[in-house]
Amino acid sequence: MSRSRQPPLVTGISPNEGIPWTKVTIRGENLGTGPTDLIGLTICGHNCLLTAEWMSASKIVCRVGQAKNDKGDIIVTTKSGGRGTSTVSFKLLKPEKIGILDQSAVWVDEMNYYDMRTDRNKGIPPLSLRPANPLGIEIEKSKFSQKDLEMLFHGMSADFTSENFSAAWYLIENHSNTSFEQLKMAVTNLKRQANKKSEGSLAYVKGGLSTFFEAQDALSAIHQKLEADGTEKVEGSMTQKLENVLNRASNTADTLFQEVLGRKDKADSTRNALNVLQRFKFLFNLPLNIERNIQKGDYDVVINDYEKAKSLFGKTEVQVFKKYYAEVETRIEALRELLLDKLLETPSTLHDQKRYIRYLSDLHASGDPAWQCIGAQHKWILQLMHSCKEGYVKDLKGNPGLHSPMLDLDNDTRPSVLGHLSQTASLKRGSSFQSGRDDTWRYKTPHRVAFVEKLTKLVLSQLPNFWKLWISYVNGSLFSETAEKSGQIERSKNVRQRQNDFKKMIQEVMHSLVKLTRGALLPLSIRDGEAKQYGGWEVKCELSGQWLAHAIQTVRLTHESLTALEIPNDLLQTIQDLILDLRVRCVMATLQHTAEEIKRLAEKEDWIVDNEGLTSLPCQFEQCIVCSLQSLKGVLECKPGEASVFQQPKTQEEVCQLSINIMQVFIYCLEQLSTKPDADIDTTHLSVDVSSPDLFGSIHEDFSLTSEQRLLIVLSNCCYLERHTFLNIAEHFEKHNFQGIEKITQVSMASLKELDQRLFENYIELKADPIVGSLEPGIYAGYFDWKDCLPPTGVRNYLKEALVNIIAVHAEVFTISKELVPRVLSKVIEAVSEELSRLMQCVSSFSKNGALQARLEICALRDTVAVYLTPESKSSFKQALEALPQLSSGADKKLLEELLNKFKSSMHLQLTCFQAASSTMMKT
């Protein structure tokens, strides 16, 4: 592929030499159209693209990298021009090593300067450092190239701190022009530096030796003075003298601080008096403080003050204290009543309930406030449940066509199953299942279903706190530590007595939940005496299977949530029973609804026939049942703890009967379609499969179906149902654990075969009777007489007309279903052969020519339809031939054979249909 631009050309670089990481400016031609066009930049063989900055088509700025080559070209590569060339080069210099004591304007990477094998993990002591100029003479850099020196001293180094230090290299590099005298002076300097290192520490000690001796003399003099003073007897020993001095100092101190200590004692007494006054002030102000704190809601402060006052003045005998303490008790009693009212107030949160119970416990309230709270909550939950039902019933009577406003889906914090309804209850059964449903269908929830959703939401919002309150009551966490210690024995006795009472409360809540749900969804399952309390919905129509499935999901989620609270299973058994009854009812309703849908399938028959002679009706029937069973998948599935829907024999029998009814309803639809008058057939949408052969012949023009054609289509559908559809449906029933599948299949197959045989006989009667009826008039047309007739010259027209009519039947059946051709033609030929045998047996006698003519026509018919002969038709042909006189001469046999060949040759085109189908008929 030719490039649109010339290759890049580098004509200049500034600077043209430098150490690694030197910033350079590259100039040239065709250096790229932009930053993205630049794809390569190498200097001395090193890739510098990462540091490259494209400025223009003639300028690039970058930094030189750590190249291996000392000198090399600058190569630029672009997308538009490819790999370029260079007319200039860049020289890469080796960086000079900076000594460890040398000043540097940049940060030195010591990893590249020193051998870390010897210096790893240890510092360099100051005395081991070498000066930058160890010889002490002027350094003069040599003019020898670094490369030449490296080649000369291979593997050595000019660094005097290196292990591979080479003195010759160092002298050539730094002192190549130094004279011999100067080098001798340098040796002297080097020796002097070595001596300084060994003499340094010794000189330090020698310089401070006189100081050490002076300190030693001073310490010895002090020691001798103390020993001399201790032996003198002036006013006793030195220790007695010291004791007298200390005693005088103590007396003097007491005299000086006597006044201060007196003031301290007075201050202490005053402080004690103020403390006593403060103690009384607390009691005097306590009634007012209690009222103020109660108004502010600071009950903790009130309780603490009360406990404090009780400990201080609870047993006082002072009258004034008794008076004020009595007022405190009055205020506290009022507080107890206030807290009890707040505790029994509904609705309230679990946190508030625990708080009020703890307050009352700390205040030593009489009775059992916690149990009173539990009882109040129980009544409140029952009241809410019944009020919810009354509200929905009232709303239903007032606005029967509207969705209940009480179901607030948006504010429901519990996981709602309405969101899953489209997955669990949607039945994709064609347009009939989706008709009239728009995006707002979920807001048209039936009132009874919405009530169950609201009822379960209500129970799950109240019962957990109710259960947790009881658990806290049992384990004593509702009460404070002091109250627990004081009333532990009495409370444990109350808990044992009230366990049965609380169990009855839970049972009553579960009973109400189940009864209210049954009243809404299963009104026939509650007794007449309970209908007013739990029912009253005035049900006009049963709920559909999809809404029952949704309600089942709702109740299941409720059961799971209650189980998570660790409520005993025996208390939740009524909910399990409800779920089972709902599942059974849902299955029944869905199957009944499916039967209704299948009954309407006849209206959808479009009579469009495919290559196999089938319409869409069998497929629609199977799809309808499959969708119904799919919608029941979640209902039939057993959740943990649930029983099978089919565990009861009665349920098995009812489901089996409904399944049989579904199959028989469809069979009835087929029968109705086969006998439907022509005027009732809607042919406006009639069509045929464009890939099929010329179906129906001339009917394409007027788009009309005859009753015979409808019979054939229904017969073809019946065959497909027997061989495929019914067996597939049985597999689907078995997949969903239906019981009595063999019975369903046997009864359905028997009904289908009965319909098939009846329709088949009707069709044969319609087609065979005209052909059979035309034989006798055709045989005796023109006053034909078997006793007196001319020698045969060929097959007469009546037989040809009969064959043409049989061919017409073949064509009509073949256009609908190839598989029906052998069955239909075999029966038609049986009827024709039977009639022909009867006619031959009725003839009293035959002449020679008559016998030959009859044998010719019988053999011609038999040979033509040989592939469709059955044992019955073969027997009829045999009887017909036996009724004829036997051929006596070979000339007659030869004439018969010639006439048969002449007949087959003349009607070869008409008889081709029988020959073409021979292989298929043999297989069939």
Swiss-Prot record:
GO terms for molecular function: protein kinase binding; small GTPase binding. The modification Phosphoserine is found at residues 431-432, 435, 888. One of its GO terms (biological process) is mitotic cytokinesis. The modification Phosphothreonine is found at residue 440. Residues 240-260 form a coiled coil. It holds the Pfam family Sec5. Keywords: Acetylation, Coiled coil, Disease variant, Exocytosis, Intellectual disability, Neurodegeneration, Phosphoprotein, Protein transport, Transport. Its main location: other. It is linked to Neurodevelopmental disorder with dysmorphic facies and cerebellar hypoplasia: An autosomal recessive disorder characterized by global developmental delay, intellectual disability, facial dysmorphism, and abnormalities of the cerebellum observed on brain imaging. Disease severity is variable. Some affected individuals have poor overall growth with microcephaly, delayed walking, spasticity, and poor or absent speech. Others may achieve more significant developmental milestones. Belongs to the SEC5 family. Component of the exocyst complex involved in the docking of exocytic vesicles with fusion sites on the plasma membrane. Interacts with RALA through the TIG domain. This is Exocyst complex component 2. The lineage of its organism: Eukaryota, Metazoa, Chordata, Craniata, Vertebrata.
